[in-house]
Amino acid sequence: MDFSDKRLSYEKGALHEEILPQEPFAMLKQWLNEAIEQNVPEPYAISLATCGSDNMPAVRTVLVREVTELGVVFYTNYLSHKGQDIEQNPHAEALFFWHDMQRQVRVRGVIAKVDRAKTEAYFQKRPYESQVGAWVSQPQSGEVASREAMDEIFANLKQKFPEGDTVPTPEFWGGYEIAATEIEFWQGRANRLHDRLLYSRASTQDTWQITRLLP
């Protein structure tokens, strides 16, 4: 397939330095709220890129569950491909992309596990079948003989953990936080002269610097 003649002019907004707060998380929350108001489906979804010791990058979609004062939090299986990558190399990058708003946000930083109490509290907020489903993936991305075999594992786990009882949080499952050292806000503009404003800092203890980047 050839898409070389396809074009879309980006003319829905602009991004100026003078409107930016001193730290990026207020701006990220503002853009998330605007995406929610415009009914963007799952605006808290990110593409998460990791790279383990094999130097082979991997990317997948995960859901952000919290924006903190340091970065963004998501939950997953620690034994998954992404969990193994993070164990070997804690540097990662996340991308929010809101196509209808012609906006994206890149979040780069260092990933660490959230404390266990935070994981436990979030797990108990999940729907019952999502809690049970977390137990099925041992490990996530592991091979299974068939869909029927997976459904049977799920049914057996529902008997083991009846609805109404507390489903224990798997030890192999929990939260990660990307502590950001760079956050770039991108707003599409006409003629491909996009607005790119980058917040950066050497560590989470430093103040943010704001730089405009060429498109």
Curated annotation (Swiss-Prot):
InterPro entries: Pyridox_Oxase, Pyridox_Oxase_CS, Pyridox_Oxase_N, Pyridoxamine_oxidase_dimer_C, Split_barrel_FMN-bd. It catalyses: pyridoxamine 5'-phosphate + O2 + H2O = pyridoxal 5'-phosphate + H2O2 + NH4(+); pyridoxine 5'-phosphate + O2 = pyridoxal 5'-phosphate + H2O2. Pfam families: PNP_phzG_C, PNPOx_N. GO terms for molecular function: FMN binding; pyridoxamine phosphate oxidase activity. Its EC number is 1.4.3.5. FMN binds at R60, T61, V62, L63, V64, R65, Y75, T76, K82, Q104, Q140, S141, W186, R196. The keyword Flavoprotein applies. Signal peptide: none annotated. Coiled coil: none annotated. Substrate binds at R7, L8, S9, Y10, R65, Y122, R126, S130, R192, L193, H194. Keywords: Flavoprotein, FMN, Oxidoreductase, Pyridoxine biosynthesis. One of its GO terms (biological process) is pyridoxine biosynthetic process. Binds 1 FMN per subunit. Its cofactor is FMN. Pathway: Cofactor metabolism; pyridoxal 5'-phosphate salvage; pyridoxal 5'-phosphate from pyridoxamine 5'-phosphate: step 1/1; Cofactor metabolism; pyridoxal 5'-phosphate salvage; pyridoxal 5'-phosphate from pyridoxine 5'-phosphate: step 1/1. It comes from the Bacteria. Homodimer. Catalyzes the oxidation of either pyridoxine 5'-phosphate (PNP) or pyridoxamine 5'-phosphate (PMP) into pyridoxal 5'-phosphate (PLP). Belongs to the pyridoxamine 5'-phosphate oxidase family. This is Pyridoxine/pyridoxamine 5'-phosphate oxidase.
